[in-house]
């Protein structure tokens, strides 16, 4: 901003239109006011008048130091635009950018806070409605609100994007202006925290269950938001005809072309940070963007597993309800393997799932988003408690997949098949079965039910111990007896129908012994052979296995 003489000229010109006693506030804005415009640029002035109601007028004046474009807005017009987009936010959006307060400093700061609180709330509701099942796990850098607003405004009215680009495109300018532009958002977030809609975690904010609940109200609310957004867009273009209100945008565009001539043909939004760069989830390798793709070769290098040029192989390894890939990254030095799992909605349930639902024995999570959330949350939670589960390296909520650690080893189900056929020694199988029981008891002791604790989801690692994979059905405080029943009956269906099932009994005793010795509840064991579970598995589990399970579990354990 220029000299004190210029500010005095501004006040004098304002007084010729609205007396000092009727002025609520005066501010200057735009390229000339903020120091990146040319000396020939107009100086833009916003005067807020108490007695003008919802009226708006634009006049041009000349001061000795500069040409002025004076926007005189009634207090009702400005506050209506801030609250409801009354004028397509053609007045309100001036408070998204730095400005110079001439009069009414506290009023202008309050207007900025109110606008940014409303926008932050709307964006938070949008996140919560888009990702309701995992929103409470997301960490939001406050810069997300700044750049998401810039992005949305720039898409509705492309000329508006130049103002943000002028202030934020160059790293040096960004360091100076970003902090100033965030102040109002930070004040707004503190208020939203006081209302219970977000919680602060370090430098980040997390949505709360209350926010998710508010965002899940009848879908007509979302429709109204979209209609209001469309109306704002229409009103922006209609109101450009109002003399002078479109001029500041054209000045910003000219300033951008003069300052960044080499970017003249570039969309100004492309020179700004992407909003999705500021939405995170915690993983076992730190914070990772929640909505972005990941280059697995870069991930392997960051984990220091590979070095040098990479070759990437992707092989589908099954999954009846998900797309699951084993990805191998071979560097000039080193090799890394990852599991990439895409979570689809269960539009066609497997026969077993249908049977479970029909008999009321078990309700599975069907939504792909819900199953991704459970896999992410439970791997993180159980891993933090020391349980042997895969580490999560990356999550992409938009594409519905996660990248997790590949556990090297032998599937325990394969070992059981060979054992029941007499092709595997008893000792390692019995020891691992007992370890499986201890593992399940520990997880139950943490208040978690696995939901899919079948032998296929246990991997015998090279060190001789087990890891548990596929936690997409895990949840808190559900039917723990189902976990015991599924392990035993599912393992039993590998037993040949003509077998005496002695090997199965040996394995089952070891599993139950491990479960009870590690603190598992006898009541849980006693409920495992209940009729509702037996009905589910009786179609493929030999009767001699069912009889053994009944005998071992009826008294609460062998």
Tell where the protein language model's regions lie, with residue ranges.
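Catalytic activation segment of kinase domains across protein kinase-like and atypical kinase folds
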Residues: 456-489, 493
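ATP-binding glycine-rich loop module of kinase domains
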Residues: 323-371
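Active-site activation/catalytic loop segments of kinase-like enzymes and analogous catalytic loops
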Residues: 483-517, 540
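Catalytic-loop of the protein kinase fold
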Residues: 445-455
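Active-site nucleotide-donor binding segment shared across nucleotidyl transfer reactions
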Residues: 11-55
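Conserved NTP/Mg2+-binding pocket subregion across the NTase superfamily
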Residues: 2-8, 58-153, 233-262
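Conserved structural core of kinase catalytic domains
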Residues: 351, 368-371, 390-432
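Juxta-kinase regulatory segment immediately upstream of eukaryotic protein kinase catalytic domains
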Residues: 249, 255-316
């Amino acid at each position: 901003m220029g000299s004190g003489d210029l500010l005095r000229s501004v006040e004098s010109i304002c007084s010729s239109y609205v007396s000092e006693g009727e002025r609520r506030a005066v501010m200057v804005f735009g390229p000339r006011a903020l120091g990146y415009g040319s000396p020939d640029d107009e100086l833009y002035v916003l005067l807020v008048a108490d007695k003008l109601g919802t009226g708006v007028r634009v006049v041009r004046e000349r001061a000795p130091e500069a040409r002025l474009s004076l926007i005189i807005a009634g207090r009702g017009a400005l506050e209506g635009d801030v609250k409801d987009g009354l004028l397509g936010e053609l007045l309100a959006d001036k408070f998204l950018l730095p400005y110079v307060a001439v009069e009414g400093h506290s009023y202008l700061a309050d207007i900025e806070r109110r606008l940014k609180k409303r926008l932050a709330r709307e964006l938070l509701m949008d996140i919560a409605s888009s990702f309701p099942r995992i929103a409470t796990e997301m960490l939001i850098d406050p810069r997300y609100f700044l750049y998401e607003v810039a992005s949305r405004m720039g898409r509705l009215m492309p000329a508006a994007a130049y103002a943000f680009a002028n202030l934020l495109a160059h790293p040096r300018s960004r360091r100076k202006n970003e902090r100033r532009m965030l102040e109002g958002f930070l004040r707004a977030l503190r208020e939203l925290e006081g209302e219970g809609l977000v919680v602060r975690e370090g430098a980040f904010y997390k949505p709360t269950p209350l926010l998710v609940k508010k965002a899940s109200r009848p879908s007509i609310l979302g429709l109204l938001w979209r209609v209001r957004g469309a109306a704002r867009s229409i009103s922006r273009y209609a109101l450009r005809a109002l003399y002078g209100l479109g001029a500041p945008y054209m000045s910003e565009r000219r300033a951008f072309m003069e300052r960044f001539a080499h970017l003249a043909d570039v969309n100004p939004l492309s020179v700004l940070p992407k909003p999705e760069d500021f939405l995170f989830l915690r993983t076992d390798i730190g914070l990772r963007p929640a909505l972005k793709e990941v280059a697995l070769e870069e991930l392997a290098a960051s984990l220091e597993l590979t070095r040098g040029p990479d070759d990437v192989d992707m092989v589908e390894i099954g999954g009846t309800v998900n797309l699951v890939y084993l990805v191998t990254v071979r560097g000039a030095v080193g090799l890394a393997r990852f599991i990439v799992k895409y979570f689809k909605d269960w539009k066609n349930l497997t026969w077993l799932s249908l049977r479970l639902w029909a008999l009321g024995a078990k309700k599975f999570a069907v939504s792909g988003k819900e199953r991704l959330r459970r896999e992410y949350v439970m791997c993180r939670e159980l891993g933090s408690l020391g349980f042997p589960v895969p580490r999560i390296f990356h999550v992409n909520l938009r594409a519905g997949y996660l990248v997790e650690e590949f556990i090297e080893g032998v599937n325990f189900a394969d070992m059981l098949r060979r054992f029941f056929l007499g092709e595997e020694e008893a000792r390692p199988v019995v020891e691992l079965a007992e370890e499986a029981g201890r593992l399940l008891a520990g997880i139950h002791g943490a208040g978690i039910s696995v939901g899919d604790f079948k032998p296929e989801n246990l991997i015998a690692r090279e060190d001789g111990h087990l890891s548990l994979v596929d936690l997409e059905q895990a949840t808190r405080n559900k039917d723990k007896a189902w976990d015991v029943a599924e392990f035993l009956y599912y393992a039993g269906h590998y037993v040949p129908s003509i077998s005496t099932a002695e090997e199965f009994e040996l394995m089952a005793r070891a599993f139950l012994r491990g479960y009870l010795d590690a603190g598992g509840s006898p009541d849980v064991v006693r409920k495992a052979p209940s009729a509702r579970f037996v009905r589910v598995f009786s179609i493929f589990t030999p009767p001699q296995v069912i009889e053994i399970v009944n005998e071992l579990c009826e008294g609460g354990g062998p």
